[in-house]
Amino acid sequence: MRQGFLMNYQIITYKSKYRDDLIFMVLEAKNALGRIPSINEDLLHIESSYTEKGGQFWIALDENDRVIGCVGCNLLPDGEAVLHRLYVKFFLKRQGIGSALLEIAEDFARENGRKTIKVHLGDKTTYFESRAFYPKHGYKFVDGDHVEKAL
């Protein structure tokens, strides 16, 4: 169990029994950003999109076993990793959950021999928070919509 500012939570590798709760959490997070909630195809098929390709997907669970955050990481053959779908339940942001998820994904990439991790930030107006979050964690802009970090 990890201690957030207001609650305890744990981070585990994805299990299919959490699929519906994960999807609901992501839709809520997108809605809170003012986006029309839609689900990305990879979230419907975590195993084939991440784990079967050598990557990994994690979820953060609260004390009631509800999904409150997620992140995925795919490993590329060129020594790079790509981070995907870092979301935290909108009313639980700024409690260290996103940072903990990011740290786990970076550790996974590093342990698997990757030297660089990259992130596509999405559109500037909708995903404005990510443009502050990643640089705070050592990521550098490589163009207007992408950041990367040497591991």
PLM region descriptions:
Residues 102, 109-123:
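Conserved GNAT acetyl-CoA-binding A-motif
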Residues 9, 13-84, 89, 102, ...:
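Acetyl-CoA-dependent GNAT
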Residues 93, 118-130, 148-151:
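Conserved beta-strand-loop-alpha-helix junction that forms the acyl-donor binding cleft
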Residues 1-6:
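Short, Lys/Arg-enriched N-terminal segments with co-localized hydrophobic residues
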Residues 88, 94-107, 132, 136:
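Conserved acetyl-CoA-binding loop-helix of GNAT-fold acetyltransferases
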Residues 84-85, 90, 107, 111-114, ...:
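A structural preference for long, well-packed, hydrophobic secondary-structure segments
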Residues 112, 136-137:
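Alpha-helix C-caps/helix-loop-beta hinges
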